[in-house]
């Protein structure tokens, strides 16, 4: 959000706090993530949604090696972010995309079953993002001969969130905020992929796994996404599911152009 300078008034601040804390608005259920302009600073909607987080691994080392070459680093990040955004943005149930540093996250929602359900489309985005990292590494290595391969951890969660509009009323500074475990869990799953589970790019919650058997991901072998996920028992999060599945045609390009 861009800043829009406005003098701070302490008395107005106290009034705003009291107004927010004493608000009695009830929150309704919704099949989809509302548009920010359809919300006020006093209401909100409960929505079932899937969240995906895609985060680079080894970016600290990357800054150390390419940090002095700021133009090179900028090109690398732009290429990575542009393609992760392009992937999640290609799905109908993707309703919001955020970029923070080298992490791209997105929210998927909609009362849709089958191939276009939020969970299935978030998993499809995961498979494409995983394969796209191989394509990017091919491109990076051709550009910088001594380039060390990059990896991205991908986390997906599904659950109920309260969506509210938050910001500073009257300033134009506003954003949607998702309250609930789904965003936090997706971030945590992302934090496990290619870190604690060093050989797995994708980590999802139990709720995602339970909804992953409703779509044939591999037509030839009649496999669902459940067939590409393996259960792990995590000390903090209980049952989580990890995998390395990827979109075949994207990955094939990377293999053929190494």
UniProtKB/Swiss-Prot annotation:
In this chain the Guanylate cyclase domain maps to: 50-190
E.C. code: 4.6.1.26
What enzyme category does the UniProt record give?
lyase
- Give the binding site residues for Mn(2+) 1: 55, 102
Listed under catalytic activity are:
UTP = 3',5'-cyclic UMP + diphosphate
Q: Which cofactor does it need?
A: Mn(2+)
Where in the cell is the protein located? Cytoplasm
The question of whether Lyase is a record keyword is answered with yes
Which GO terms of the molecular function aspect are on file? Answer: adenylate cyclase activity; metal ion binding; nucleotide binding
User: What does the record give as the function of this protein?
Assistant: Pycsar (pyrimidine cyclase system for antiphage resistance) provides immunity against bacteriophage. The pyrimidine cyclase (PycC) synthesizes cyclic nucleotides in response to infection; these serve as specific second messenger signals. The signals activate the adjacent effector, leading to bacterial cell death and abortive phage infection. A clade C Pycsar system. The pyrimidine cyclase gene of a two-gene Pycsar system, weakly generates cyclic UMP (cUMP) from UTP, has little to no activity on ATP, CTP or GTP. Expression of this and adjacent effector GmPycTM (AC P0DV43) probably confers resistance to bacteriophage. The genes are probably only expressed in response to bacteriophage infection.
Q: What is this protein called?
A: Uridylate cyclase
């Amino acid at each position: 959000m861009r800043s829009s300078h406005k003098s701070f008034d302490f008395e107005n601040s106290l009034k705003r706090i009291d107004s927010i804390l004493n608000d009695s608005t009830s929150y309704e259920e919704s099949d989809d993530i509302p548009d920010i302009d359809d919300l006020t600073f006093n209401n909100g909607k409960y929505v079932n949604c899937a969240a995906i987080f895609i985060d680079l691994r080894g970016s600290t080392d990357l800054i150390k090696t390419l940090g002095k070459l700021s133009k090179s680093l900028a090109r690398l990040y732009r290429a990575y972010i542009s393609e992760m955004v392009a992937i999640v943005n290609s799905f109908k149930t993707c309703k919001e995309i955020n970029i923070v540093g080298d992490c791209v996250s997105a929210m998927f929602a909609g009362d849709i079953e089958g191939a276009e359900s939020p969970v299935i489309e978030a998993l499809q985005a995961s498979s494409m993002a995983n394969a796209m990292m191989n394509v990017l590494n091919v491109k990076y290595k051709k550009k910088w001969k001594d380039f060390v391969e990059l990896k991205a951890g991908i986390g997906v969660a599904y659950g109920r969130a309260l969506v509210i509009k938050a910001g500073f009323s009257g300033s134009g500074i506003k954003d949607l905020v998702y309250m609930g475990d789904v965003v936090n869990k997706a971030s945590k799953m992302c934090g496990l992929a290619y870190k604690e589970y060093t050989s797995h790019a994708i980590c999802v919650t139990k709720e995602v796994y339970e909804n992953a058997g409703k779509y044939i991901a591999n037509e030839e072998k009649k496999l669902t996404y459940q067939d590409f996920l393996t259960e792990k028992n995590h000390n903090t999060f209980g049952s989580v599911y990890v995998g390395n599945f990827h979109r075949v045609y994207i990955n094939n390009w990377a293999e053929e152009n190494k």
